[in-house]
Amino acid sequence: MSKGRFTPLASLRRLLLRILVVLAVFWGGGIALFSVVPVPFSAVMVERQISAWLQGDFGYVAHSDWAGMDAISPWMGLAVIAAEDQKFPEHWGFDVSAIEKALAHNERNENRIRGASTLSQQTAKNLFLWDGRSWLRKGLEAGLTVGLETVWSKKRILTVYLNIAEFGDGVFGVEAASQRYFNKPASRLSMSEAALLAAVLPNPLRFKANAPSGYVRSRQAWILRQMRQLGGESFMTRNHLY
């Protein structure tokens, strides 16, 4: 009798373990595969597409065109590093000082939460996980980030990030964004245009690259200053990112 009472719990544990094993194999395989193969779509793209269909919007298309780093202007990589993660070449996936500052800020300003995700974390989240905030998702994100940093080069992480980042409603990846907003390939983006695209990244569904608000213009100017302070294009070659 005693053994029977514990059977449902044991079965649940076995089921959860099997699910975790399947997910680990799936994500591990994805990390290995996408270290060399172009990424056709991300979890965020799938989530956006399904959400649109469920709302009856059958005209929505989550669009992305893969571009290798040699087909992307070096200004674009520099712009997202300047805007999102200036220690990207140095850290192993996590910026401890940025996390500490974000925690201190969030304790003082509970209504204005600040994140501290690195480009590596954002790539892991956008590629493999669902949108939202939870300790479970953050834990999975941390594990996937370690996987990316272990298997991929920094250049590969940046390349995938630029190809799956959301730049507007249905616009994913810098090639699609460059064509949509500037009618040119990503390889021809100027320093100013790259900074403008990077300026909308905190909230690409609210901020518009084709109709920039005063805040977006101000952020663009700040990013341009940071790009110059980092050393311009030489920063990319010096850190083997281009």
From Swiss-Prot:
Location within or outside the cell: Cell inner membrane
Residue ranges of the TM segments: 19-39
Signal peptide: none
InterPro entries: Glyco_trans_51 (IPR001264), Lysozyme-like_dom_sf (IPR023346), PBP_transglycosylase (IPR036950), Pep_trsgly (IPR011812)
GO molecular function: pentosyltransferase activity; peptidoglycan glycosyltransferase activity
Source species, domain of life: Bacteria
Catalytic activity: [GlcNAc-(1->4)-Mur2Ac(oyl-L-Ala-gamma-D-Glu-L-Lys-D-Ala-D-Ala)](n)-di-trans,octa-cis-undecaprenyl diphosphate + beta-D-GlcNAc-(1->4)-Mur2Ac(oyl-L-Ala-gamma-D-Glu-L-Lys-D-Ala-D-Ala)-di-trans,octa-cis-undecaprenyl diphosphate = [GlcNAc-(1->4)-Mur2Ac(oyl-L-Ala-gamma-D-Glu-L-Lys-D-Ala-D-Ala)](n+1)-di-trans,octa-cis-undecaprenyl diphosphate + di-trans,octa-cis-undecaprenyl diphosphate + H(+)
Job of this protein: Peptidoglycan polymerase that catalyzes glycan chain elongation from lipid-linked precursors.
UniProt name for this protein: Biosynthetic peptidoglycan transglycosylase
Organism: Citrobacter koseri (strain ATCC BAA-895 / CDC 4225-83 / SGSC4696)
